[in-house]
């Protein structure tokens, strides 16, 4: 059992993961999860709004509705994200 965790307790960096690398990986994973959630919510909302009778194809009005709905959803998401990030920056400046 002596070897268990020895890479972490020893001074060598061969077995250690760099904290910065781990943080970057976590940030990427969070960004991917957020993008997946955004896409899923947008798809659900726009489908419910624009598709009255699901079929094998979308008619012209459904295609236009989906495109406009997704554009509006993304615009709203970006507006909220900018406002949220701005607020976080202001709060961090006061700390």
Curated annotation (Swiss-Prot):
Organism: Danio rerio
MF GO annotations: metal ion binding
Subcellular location: Mitochondrion inner membrane
Domain notes: The twin CX3C motif contains 4 conserved Cys residues that form 2 disulfide bonds in the mitochondrial intermembrane space. However, during the transit of TIMM13 from cytoplasm into mitochondrion, the Cys residues probably coordinate zinc, thereby preventing folding and allowing its transfer across mitochondrial outer membrane.
Bilayer topology: Peripheral membrane protein
Similarity-based family: Belongs to the small Tim family.
Record key words, sorted: Chaperone, Disulfide bond, Membrane, Metal-binding, Mitochondrion, Mitochondrion inner membrane, Protein transport, Translocation, Transport, Zinc
The UniProt record lists the keyword Protein transport: yes
Plastid in keyword set: no
Pfam families assigned: zf-Tim10_DDP
Encoding gene (name): timm13
InterPro entries the UniProt entry points to: Tim10-like (IPR004217), Tim10-like_dom_sf (IPR035427)
Summary of the function given for this chain in its UniProt record: Mitochondrial intermembrane chaperone that participates in the import and insertion of some multi-pass transmembrane proteins into the mitochondrial inner membrane. Also required for the transfer of beta-barrel precursors from the TOM complex to the sorting and assembly machinery (SAM complex) of the outer membrane. Acts as a chaperone-like protein that protects the hydrophobic precursors from aggregation and guide them through the mitochondrial intermembrane space.
UniProt xrefs under Gene3D superfamilies: Mitochondrial import inner membrane translocase subunit tim13 like domains
Major place of residence: mitochondrion
GO terms, biological process: protein insertion into mitochondrial inner membrane
Cystine pairings recorded for this chain: 46-69, 50-65
Subunit structure: Heterohexamer; composed of 3 copies of TIMM8 (TIMM8A or TIMM8B) and 3 copies of TIMM13, named soluble 70 kDa complex. Associates with the TIM22 complex, whose core is composed of TIMM22.
Protein name in the entry: Mitochondrial import inner membrane translocase subunit Tim13
A single GO cellular-component term on record: mitochondrial intermembrane space protein transporter complex
Motif (Twin CX3C motif): 46-69
């Amino acid at each position: 059992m002596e070897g268990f965790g020895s890479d972490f307790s020893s001074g060598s960096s061969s077995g250690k993961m760099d904290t910065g690398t781990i943080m970057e990986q976590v940030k990427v994973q969070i960004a991917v999860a957020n993008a997946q959630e955004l896409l899923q919510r947008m798809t659900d909302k726009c489908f419910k709004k624009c598709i009255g009778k699901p079929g094998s194809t979308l008619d012209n009005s459904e295609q236009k509705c989906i495109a406009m709905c997704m554009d509006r959803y993304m615009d709203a998401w970006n507006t909220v994200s900018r406002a949220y990030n701005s607020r976080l920056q202001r709060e961090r400046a006061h700390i």
